[in-house]
Amino acid sequence: MVDTRAVVGFGGGAEAYERGRPGYPADAVAWLAERLSLVPGRTVLDLGAGTGKLSRLLVETGARVVAVEPVEEMRRLLETVTGVEALAGAAEAIPLPDASVDACTIAQAFHWFEPVVALAEIHRVLRPGSALALLWNRLDEADPLTAAFTEVLARYRAHASVGYAWSEGFDRADFFTPIELRTFANVQELDAETIADRLASESSIAVLPAEQRRQALREVRALAPKTVVLRYLTEVYVSNRRA
């Protein structure tokens, strides 16, 4: 079952998500491609793919990219990404046969899943000897501007952030090996409009009453009178499939 906060929040904000969310740094993608052996002839599942922020980078590895996304508005944009096979579906019921993919990636999405059910499904579609990678772009609050952006987000968000509770799913299930973490620096250049899109892309902002949402967007626009940079830590978690 897809979390209704994700459906409501992302369904109405798919365009803002595509414009406002950062991509992933080249060194992170290169490490991921090597770690997951993403080469021509292999198939990678990008699960909860959104608008294809990671999917389009996976295409560059030469691997076949199958992307699954439950939110229709996000999937419409995903379908425009060259080289990606976009499917409707959820992590808890992946529309693929058993042992049909060589790797699975999940970017900015696993925290929305029912973790144990999703891990069982991912284990089912992965071939033996393969691996799962989870990615998040975390706002780096050591940077003053990024901290100011985060303060506005925290003050206005309509529901609490879904934090590191996602890892409990790995503790409760025995489908994958202990998680390996690599962290990479990431930067995003924004102006007044794209920093507003960045805020609007948060599901907890998208569901606010209209006037509150407008006020939050005014506040972040004021942070970017000219082109500015938000800083992130891109976290890549990798776990191998157990037999």
Residue ranges and their predicted role:
Residues 117-188:
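Conserved catalytic/acceptor-binding region of the Class I
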Residues 1-40:
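Conserved class I S-adenosyl-L-methionine
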Residues 92-103:
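A short acidic, Gly/Pro-enriched loop at the edge of an enzyme's catalytic core
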Residues 41-42, 99:
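Nucleotide donor/acceptor-binding cores
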Residues 33, 56-59, 119, 123:
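A structural alpha-helix within SAM-dependent methyltransferase catalytic domains
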Residues 43-45, 51-93:
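Class I SAM-dependent methyltransferase SAM/SAH-binding core
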Residues 166-243:
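Conserved Class I S-adenosyl-L-methionine
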Residues 102-116:
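A short SAM/SAH-binding and catalytic strip from SAM-dependent methyltransferases
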